[in-house]
Amino acid sequence: MACDEEKPKCRSCTRRATPCTYTNSVGLNHLAKAAQASSPYSKPEPGSGFPPVPYNHDGFVLNGNNAVQANSPLPLAPPSPLALNMPHLELLHHFIAVTSEVLGVETISRQVWKSTIPQIALSHDFLMHSILAVAALHIAHLRPEQRRSYWERTAMHQDRALELQQEAMANASRDNADALFSFSLLVVYYAFASPKVSGSQEAEEPLAGAIQCISIIRGMRYLLPPIRQWVEEGPLAQLLSIHPGNMKSNHSFKDHDTELYFQRFLVLCSTSSDMNKTHEFEDIEQCAAAASTLRASFLTAESVADGGLKAPPIWHWACRLAPEFLQRLGKLHPIPLVLVAHWCVILAQVRQYWWIQGWVDHTMGQIQKTLPREYHEWLDWPMKKVQEQRENWSREGERIGSS
């Protein structure tokens, strides 16, 4: 069955859990259409209530003084060197003043997002477009009454960022290594936040959002090695210092019951009758490896909490998954679904951040509806832990509010 080239993601490829040849390599969902490079004007849908916004051919919004009427036969005049692009300045200011404070989970990371990365973006258009896209996405999240307008700007900047990043990645070097690394992080935040902000979350096929996020996180695994040495020698080296691979973890859980639970869980993932029926022994190995890596991520998260960091390494597990695991997840096989439900426990520890708000509950709900009933007992532990974290955050909020 051929790719039907349907956006945001073709249904044929989704049903077969195969990579879509029509989407770009990052595979992001975009509900809004990209601005047409051949036209200086965006074209909102009829009846949307939003007037057309003038763009130049690089995808940047033009100052109103340089706009040309839509029915004008004259070509778009180049903007004056003195013209200020207020829409871009608005987004950049918001990113530096507001968004940067709610991206990084550590003080060291927040300072990098606030100062270092915007400075790097001044020399790399693809990173600047990505920054503006995430800023617009954040504003759309904060201002529901203006969500449509800012989502259109989000999609336009993200499309342009992806286009320019492909060329930069093909020519990776010391000069653009930090920009590529920063971009890869922004794309992950974008992937988690965009379905809810755009309104596509309820319309997507089961687990489509989770599969997309995992796929993008896995992409970092291939992007980083060629540029890692340059990043380690540059201003973003401190971000690599908090990578899970650089953190020590315990060999077993402090809580004996948790240790016993994960021992049973590893047995389930290694001997599932569902997989034995199909004799797909390679898949059994992949799920067993995924379960073992997930246990290691929980141990690292427990050790990080003891060390005083405010959030666990939430992407470590997804980054190490094999492509075969994603294929089984796309087919909604039980063991991958149960594993993602357990990953949600780690993600729930950062649920206060805007870019992941609602993601855990939505994904857990989809898994509960999709998972065969005989496996539902394996949702009890992750659902209990997510509920405990929800109650802890609620109590913490009440404590702060009363202080």
Question: What do these predicted ranges mean?
Answer:
Residues M1-G27, I120:
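N-terminal cysteine-rich, zinc-dependent DNA-binding domains of eukaryotic transcription factors
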Residues T14, M86-S100, I120-R143, M156-R160, ...:
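Amphipathic alpha-helical regulatory regions
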Residues N24-A34, Y55-R153, Q166-N171:
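Internal amphipathic alpha-helical repeat/solenoid segments
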Residues Q111-K114, H157-A170, I314-L329:
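Short amphipathic alpha-helical segments and their helix-coil junctions
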Residues Q119, G209-R228, P235-S403:
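C-terminal effector modules of eukaryotic transcription factors
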Residues W151-Q166, Y189-E232:
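Structured all-alpha helical bundle cores of eukaryotic regulatory proteins
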